[in-house]
Amino acid sequence: MLHGPKKHSHLSNTMGSRLLIRPYFPPRNLCHSQDATTLLRELQDAFDSYNQSFRGEIMRFQKAFAERVLNMVEARYPVNQLKINAEILTRKVCYHSPAHDPLDLALERQQYLFIYVSCEKIQELLFNRRFLVGTEAAVATSIQPYRSELSRGEMARVHNLAWRRRQTKESDMDCFVAIFSSTLFVSWYEARAVDIYGDEVLCPFLIRQATGDRDYDVVAYGFTKFAENATSRRLPARASSFLDLKLGPPVSATDDEAADGEPTLGPGETRTSA
């Protein structure tokens, strides 16, 4: 999920050294957030920082890129596809290098998503500087990492219900990567988790199919605040309601014409919640 073999699209190869250097958004390191409330507020600040300052920088880059592409004299493929993409890039933020196809674009209704990974995967993220999607699908949820009423074991269980092609362990719930949803994500599965108080919590999952080797902007990363799995200990008092980081319902495959369809179900797989 965080890395894959190096592959380059035909569009990327076409531009070659003529590509402009895309601005880099340094993901916010939230590993030192001491509690769930602090993590919530620091996450909100990180998303606000991307929206308020970096989006303008990205659009300036994309318009310069588009101008360069549209001035190219070649008309054959893949240059003609680059020109089609360039027109789109003058209007919508793209979360990765614009030389890749299909484009993964910002949604009109923003939604914050979280991809849960092990500490080892976070180290790879720090090394790569960006979230690299290669040969595996990216499995994300709108369930936030500060949800301390949910246990690591229960979160691993519902991840395995949502995506049975990869075995998720409790250690994969130790860390999170915060990103924006985008046009290549499709609404996939809604699981029912049970929190440490015995209450049911709906967990929506979204899938972005493997797209070849491309890197994506990461807004923030850090340690989750999910509960330990021991049930014999005395339960903590239920936390007061958190601010909701979700800015809209999960995107469906029909929300944007740029979404490229649902992943294919494997044998015995179902999207009906257990």
UniProtKB/Swiss-Prot annotation:
Keywords: Plasmid
Transmembrane domains' residue ranges: none
InterPro entries, per database record: Glycosidase
Pfam families documented for this protein: RolB_RolC
Source domain of life: Bacteria
Region (Disordered): 248-274
Keyword Kinase among record annotations: no
Protein purpose: Contributes to the root inducing activity.
Family: Belongs to the rolB/rolC family.
Name assigned to this protein: Protein RolB(TR)
Organism of derivation: Rhizobium rhizogenes
Taxonomy of the source species: Bacteria, Pseudomonadati, Pseudomonadota, Alphaproteobacteria, Hyphomicrobiales
